From Swiss-Prot:
Active site: 65
Organism of origin: Psychromonas ingrahamii (strain DSM 17664 / CCUG 51855 / 37)
Gene Ontology biological process terms from the UniProt entry: 'de novo' pyrimidine nucleobase biosynthetic process; 'de novo' UMP biosynthetic process
Family of the protein in this entry: Belongs to the OMP decarboxylase family. Type 1 subfamily.
Cross-referenced CDD domains: OMP_decarboxylase_like
Gene of this entry: pyrF
Function of the protein: Catalyzes the decarboxylation of orotidine 5'-monophosphate (OMP) to uridine 5'-monophosphate (UMP).
Protein name (Swiss-Prot/TrEMBL): Orotidine 5'-phosphate decarboxylase
Length: 234
């Protein structure tokens, strides 16, 4: 597999056993993918695990979706930056002041600052879920509303469904990064993600980075699956 200038695939790690996780990671080349550490693994293994991945030269997306008062979120984002992560996220529904505080605290890091990304509408949520929260907008409308707020707050991009990507690129510009979960290679089970696309469809729609978990982590030959995905994006 040739070295990729900007790997598009972010592998979502979902292991409860640290040694299993490290064995899986040992098969990967950081030139060909990035890694996502979410709440479950971070709670299991802590920041030292993230440091291990960074030391192996992987770009790490720390997916903890911070949502709290501005000062608390800013402090947490600073700690993430000190871990050396490539990307960190916050909930856009925390509001503009929270997002602005998180962005401001990263200023001293300059070009070494992680990408600061907002979560809009979780891909498992549909219209009925939003209505139960008192939101009468469609998922797509709510995504646009929160994505615009994130850009106004100075953030680098948003997590969004591939189905919103094309419109968001047009609305918010090419430099505003779109990170897309709910990606399944052809023939994969949809799992718990309601709004899904294949990797090529998502990139063609405007997504910049693709979060893919079980189709790679649970594959018999994960390196081959990753290679096939990367090849499909060339």
């Amino acid at each position: 597999m040739n070295q990729l200038v900007d790997p598009k695939v972010v592998i979502a790690l979902d292991y409860q056993d640290k040694q299993q996780a490290l064995h899986f990671i040992s098969q990967l080349d950081p030139k060909h993918c990035r890694l996502k550490v979410g709440k479950e693994m971070f709670t299991h293994f802590g920041p030292e695990f993230v440091k291990q991945l960074v030391a192996k030269e992987f770009d790490v997306f720390l997916d903890l979706k911070f949502h709290d008062i501005p000062n608390t979120v800013a402090s947490a984002v600073k700690v993430a930056a000190d871990l050396g992560v490539w990307m960190v996220n916050v909930h856009a529904s925390g509001g503009r002041r929270m997002m602005e505080a998180a962005k401001k605290i990263l200023e001293p890091y300059g070009t070494n600052a992680p990408l600061l990304i907002a979560v809009t509408v979780l891909t498992s949520m549909d219209q009925s879920d939003l209505q139960e929260l008192g939101i009468e907008l469609s998922p797509a409308e709510q995504v646009k509303r929160l994505a615009k707020l994130a850009k106004l707050s100075g953030l680098d991009g948003v997590v969004c469904s591939a189905h919103e990507a094309q419109e968001l690129k047009t609305l918010l510009g090419a430099e505003f990064k779109l990170i897309t979960p709910g990606i399944r290679p052809m023939g994969s089970d949809a799992g718990d993600q309601r709004r899904i696309m294949t990797p090529k469809q998502a990139i063609d729609a405007g997504s910049d980075y693709l979060v893919i978990g079980r189709p790679i982590t649970r594959a018999t030959n994960p390196v081959e699956v990753l290679k096939n995905i990367n090849d499909s994006l060339v």
